[in-house]
Curated annotation (Swiss-Prot):
CDD domains: TMP_TenI. Keywords: Magnesium, Metal-binding, Thiamine biosynthesis, Transferase. Belongs to the thiamine-phosphate synthase family. This is Thiamine-phosphate synthase. Pathway: Cofactor biosynthesis; thiamine diphosphate biosynthesis; thiamine phosphate from 4-amino-2-methyl-5-diphosphomethylpyrimidine and 4-methyl-5-(2-phosphoethyl)-thiazole: step 1/1. The keyword ATP-binding does not apply. Mg(2+) binds at residues 70, 89. It catalyses: 2-[(2R,5Z)-2-carboxy-4-methylthiazol-5(2H)-ylidene]ethyl phosphate + 4-amino-2-methyl-5-(diphosphooxymethyl)pyrimidine + 2 H(+) = thiamine phosphate + CO2 + diphosphate; 2-(2-carboxy-4-methylthiazol-5-yl)ethyl phosphate + 4-amino-2-methyl-5-(diphosphooxymethyl)pyrimidine + 2 H(+) = thiamine phosphate + CO2 + diphosphate; 4-methyl-5-(2-phosphooxyethyl)-thiazole + 4-amino-2-methyl-5-(diphosphooxymethyl)pyrimidine + H(+) = thiamine phosphate + diphosphate. GO terms for biological process: thiamine biosynthetic process; thiamine diphosphate biosynthetic process. It holds the Pfam family TMP-TENI. Transmembrane segments: none annotated.
Amino acid sequence: MEINYELYLITDRRFLKGRQLKKVVEDAILGGVTIVQVREKDVSTREFYNVAKEVKEVTDYYKVPIIINDRLDIAQAIDASGVHLGQKDMHLNIAREILGKDKIIGISVGNVKEALQAQNNGADYLGIGTIFPTGSKKDVDAIIGIDGLSKIKDSISIPSVAIGGINKTNFKDVLKTGIEGISVISAILDEDDIKLAANNLLINK
């Protein structure tokens, strides 16, 4: 499956400001988002399922891949395109056994060792970060910056997206590393005009 990782949106309902998640995701896709990850923390399984199913209606309509953060059961229940796993989540090999070879599995990495391990274990793509300080994620172990991103990117051959504090003022510097895409939350969701915010993060508008 050929995936376009150019503009990777991660959902966070804290930024909705009373707006409907489905509408926000649709506007983001219309603005240029190429892949969507549904990320829900501290909610019940049923609520996560309902949110993911709602988002999938939009991504299916626009033929955009939908990735579920962490929860393989939710990914299976809605027949998502794949999952994204952190370093402390289920081991990639087990996730692959459960989901099968046709699903996308992405792994969060913060250094060359983690990146090579994930690649060798069969990850489809990597989420590399944290690049810049960010307010969206509190448990940031280390800010790696552009230099750290470049080192990791140069060590691997699979697709990767950069994450962490990326916005319209710095995304071009990130893309100069040759990375396949950028992953954002607040740079799109915290803006009033979602479609424009997404479009402002595209290098070839």
